[in-house]
Amino acid sequence: MPDMAALVVLNQARLWHKHGMVSRASRSDRSRKPLSAAKLDELALAYVARFATSRAKLTRYLARKVRESEWVDESDARTACEAVADRMERLRFLDDRQYAAMRAGAMTRRGLGLRRVKAQLFVDGIADADSGEAIAEAGEQAVAAAVGFARRRRFGPFAVRADDDPKSRERQVAAFARAGHSLALARRILAVPPGDADALAALDDAATTD
């Protein structure tokens, strides 16, 4: 039979656990601030003033704020989020086509390839109709972006010395692939000897795809 003292301790632990959990839950409920459609509009204005964003990213942000708060408006929260996004578009604070061009251009200048650009615009919720021009431009800049990547990483023509180790070469090809470049284009650039400016200049301007 259990010791009486042990039973007392066990019961105290159970009571503490029960009331402690209730207390924490109550504090959590109290910390959920009320949120209305008007406040949602204010949050959106602050967000677009601070960040360049897409419609999808803004609506995700607003939806998260709704989840973290106590919705007190009569309108449906999801409908309210979409209505706020509509208003931001009418005010020209949101323009997915312009955002896509800016985002793709920045990625290309950082040496990232077409595949990474496409993937990022998809994640950002950009529709095909709004991303098409940006993706086409990234395709036209594929060689320049890959050369920029090689320069940043000191691969191929930008290496201090030639590296003929096959394993090292494949690691470099893999790095190009992770950056969104085609394997064929990566191998063309890596085949250029260090310091051979003429061979580097002779690379095609068009993107090479697998």
Label the predicted regions.
Residues 2-210:
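An alpha-helical, amphipathic repeat domain used for nucleic-acid recognition
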